[in-house]
């Protein structure tokens, strides 16, 4: 089978080329993102492989379907860039539901430590031989309260890490776990009680801007907010106002609400048009990185292997374990898992 691989980066080739020979598939790497204008590059291919910033809307789906493409392979866990109602009975859409939850949770912790102890600022100083530590004081995590929103695999691992620091952990999830060794509370209690808040939930209608002006008003002024999940979980305008008015102590972002035109690209010689992103990056207590929480060797190996396995299942006519359709719930599954029958 032939795969048109969109938004390809050099590191994608490293791991996909390592495994694709085993499957006997052909991959055409395309640097451009998938859009209506670039669908023509998939003509003659059985599948397209896409990432978080590729466009898989109705127009793109209709065009791909007419060209004979049968499968959309998401090499990521998130799927909010796909119009599932339009793809139903036209294209099978499969994702990588979990590649390395440890990678993301560990990175969230790294952001937390950097924002709290200001190691990124210390590094910048010492590079210029400035060994002054004024303004670099942080706080002990031990004994503090952490609020974790989203208790799937990543959230649960993050909770284990926070427990390791000796923190009390409060959690919120629309689908609470039954075997929790931590306390579930309301969102209001998360905002009011937490010294640290870490986001680990998917982006849905219910969670879009879950962190908003009202939430910031309820937070402690010294609280630290970490987001390694999806940018639109946070209302960017409200975040900027909260930082400007010292309503929050620090912020670590690996995702951004309008990241599509910037993240994963080299814009070092450009003048950024996104004033909100520029404003956020100007704050001394805000640390922004470019959606790299997933990026470990183990995660990339798992992404490549699972993506190719997904296509192999389709080729063989097997049950598509990682398929998503418009009937699936927010967590990316539906009753088909019980019956072992594909979405269509």
Question: For the regions a protein language model found, what residue spans apply to each?
Answer:
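Rossmann-like dinucleotide-binding domain for NAD(H)/NADP(H)
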Residues: 222, 232-344
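Phosphate-binding beta-alpha-beta segment of Rossmann-like dinucleotide-binding domains, i.e.
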Residues: 89-145, 157-160, 164, 326
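Short glycine-/small-residue-rich Rossmann-like dinucleotide-binding loops
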Residues: 52-53, 195, 201-203, 229-230, ...
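An N-terminal-biased, well-structured beta-alpha scaffold segment characteristic
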Residues: 2-94, 212
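Short acidic/histidine-rich motifs immediately flanking catalytic phosphotransfer sites
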Residues: 42-47, 67-69, 192-197, 220-223
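A short helix->loop->beta-strand "cap" motif at the edges of active sites that frequently abuts
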Residues: 66-71, 89-91, 167, 221-223, ...
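Rossmann-like dinucleotide/phosphate-binding beta-alpha-beta segment
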Residues: 134-221, 341-344
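Glycine-rich nucleotide-phosphate-binding loops and adjacent flexible coil segments
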Residues: 226
């Amino acid at each position: 089978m032939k795969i048109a691989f969109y938004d390809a980066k050099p590191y994608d080739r490293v791991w996909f080329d390592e495994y694709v020979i085993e499957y006997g598939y052909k991959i055409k790497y395309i640097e451009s993102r998938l859009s209506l204008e670039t669908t023509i590059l998939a003509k003659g291919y059985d599948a397209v492989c896409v990432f978080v910033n590729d466009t898989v809307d109705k127009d793109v789906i209709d065009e791909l379907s007419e060209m004979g493409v049968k499968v959309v392979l998401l090499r990521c866990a998130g799927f909010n860039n796909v119009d599932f109602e339009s793809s139903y009975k036209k294209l099978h859409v499969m994702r990588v539901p979990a590649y390395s939850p440890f990678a993301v949770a560990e990175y969230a912790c790294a952001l937390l430590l950097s924002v709290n102890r200001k190691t990124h600022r210390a590094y910048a100083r010492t590079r210029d031989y400035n060994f002054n530590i004024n303004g670099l004081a942080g706080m002990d995590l031990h004994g503090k309260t952490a609020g974790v929103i989203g208790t799937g695999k990543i959230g649960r691992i993050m909770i284990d890490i926070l427990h390791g620091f000796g923190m009390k952990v409060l959690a919120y999830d629309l689908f609470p776990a039954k075997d929790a060794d931590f306390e579930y509370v309301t969102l209001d209690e998360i905002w009011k009680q937490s010294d640290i808040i870490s986001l680990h939930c998917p982006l849905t209608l219910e969670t879009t801007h879950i962190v908003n002006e009202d939430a910031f008003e309820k937070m402690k002024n010294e609280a630290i907010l970490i987001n390694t999940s999806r940018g639109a979980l946070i209302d960017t305008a409200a975040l900027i106002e909260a930082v400007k008015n010292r309503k929050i102590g620090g912020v670590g972002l690996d995702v951004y609400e309008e990241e599509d035109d910037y993240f994963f690209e080299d814009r070092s010689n450009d003048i950024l048009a996104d004033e909100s992103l520029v404003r956020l990056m100007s704050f001394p207590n805000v640390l922004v990185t470019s959606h790299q929480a997933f990026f470990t060797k183990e995660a990339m190996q798992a992404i490549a292997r699972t993506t190719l396995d997904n296509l192999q299942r389709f080729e063989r006519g097997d049950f598509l374990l990682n398929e998503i359709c418009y009937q699936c719930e927010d967590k990316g599954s539906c009753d088909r898992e019980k019956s072992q029958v594909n979405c269509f």
